[in-house]
From Swiss-Prot:
Protein name, per record: UPF0178 protein SG1713
NCBIfam families: PRK00124.1
Family classification: Belongs to the UPF0178 family.
CDD domains registered for this protein in UniProt: PIN_YqxD-like
Segments passing through the bilayer: none
């Protein structure tokens, strides 16, 4: 079981939580990005740099993620694809994407894209707060304990 991170848009504070968890639980964590990223020295943390381009990072994560892996992403289409492969998807706000509701989230995302494309301004998500960081850490810890129980 591994953790895959859609790292280009992942907040630094979430990456720091992941770094600590990777070392503490000795779980391979790979940050996939189209730019160079600083990471702490650890045999459990690595970066995978891919070419710049539309969905290149997403496609690489989909290709590499396996059933039971955890994917960290705020990208709903990416979450849908890894869920279909049997991986879990967690967004940086601590929401664990569910197979039962991912289609609804995709539809809402597409609708919001249509609104923005027609010139209607929509608000983005609020800043990442303490509550979201705690929920992310709680969900991550829950997954890590499940992995430890299987070892």
């Amino acid at each position: 079981m591994e953790i895959w991170v859609d790292a280009d848009a992942c907040p630094r504070v979430i990456k720091e939580i992941l770094f600590r968890a990777a070392v503490r639980h000795e779980i391979q964590t790979t940050l996939v990005a189209n730019q160079s990223l600083p990471v702490p020295p650890s045999r459990f943390i690595r970066t995978l740099r891919v070419a710049a381009g539309f969905d290149v990072v997403d496609n690489e994560i989909v290709k590499r993620a396996a059933a039971g892996d955890l994917v960290i992403t705020a990208d709903i289409p990416l979450a849908a694809e890894v869920l279909a492969k049997g991986a879990l998807a967690l967004n940086p706000r601590g929401e664990l994407y569910q197979q039962a509701t991912i289609r609804e989230k995709l539809t809402l995302r597409d609708f919001m894209d249509t609104l923005r494309g027609s010139g209607i301004q929509t608000d983005g998500p609020p800043p990442l707060g303490q509550r979201e960081r705690q929920e992310f850490a709680r969900q991550l810890d829950k997954w890590l304990h499940q992995v430890q129980a299987r070892r």
